[in-house]
Amino acid sequence: MSKDFDDFVEGLQDQIFQETRAVYGDIAFQRWLNPLYMGRLENPDGYGRVTGSCGDTMEIFLNFENGNVKNACFQTDGCGSSTVCGSFAAEQSLGKSPDQILNITGKTILETLGRLPEEDKHCAFLSADALQEALNDYMIKQQKKLK
């Protein structure tokens, strides 16, 4: 490739990064570049899958140890905002008890992010709903163990 083409591509990438950072803020931008906790857990203690009205699907996987979340991860087929929100939903659940997870909502995820475009705010609620589904799955399994 020519140096001119390489310079053009690099300049275009820099422009995209600057515009994305301006719209999403630094916290969401950094997580967009490096989404933490993305993946699947084999045999999770809790699993939640929710498809939003936008068509994005969010999956949350939880493993518990001594009553608290030991491992958490997410998978999505959605946009960058869904990826960012899924990453924060998984992160916020780590080390938490079921009662504490109940307090993780779309609003708390948005507060952590600082800002998200208005048209993408539903992604935080999609992530929180999937997290609550995973918690519900875990609680049902715990109840069955008691019987």
List PLM regions with ranges.
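A short catalytic or substrate-binding loop motif that flags glycine-/basic-rich loops and adjacent residues
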Residues: 41, 51-55
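Flexible, glycine-rich terminal cap/loop adjacent to redox cofactors
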Residues: 88-98
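Short beta-strand elements
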Residues: 56-67
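C-terminal binding/interaction regions
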Residues: 1-42, 47, 65, 96-147
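Short, thiol/selenol-centered motifs that function as redox-active sites or metal-ligating centers
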Residues: 54, 76-85, 123
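Immediate flanking context of iron-sulfur cluster ligation sites
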Residues: 68-77, 111-114
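Short, solvent-exposed loop/turn elements at beta->coil junctions and helix N-caps
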Residues: 45-50, 75
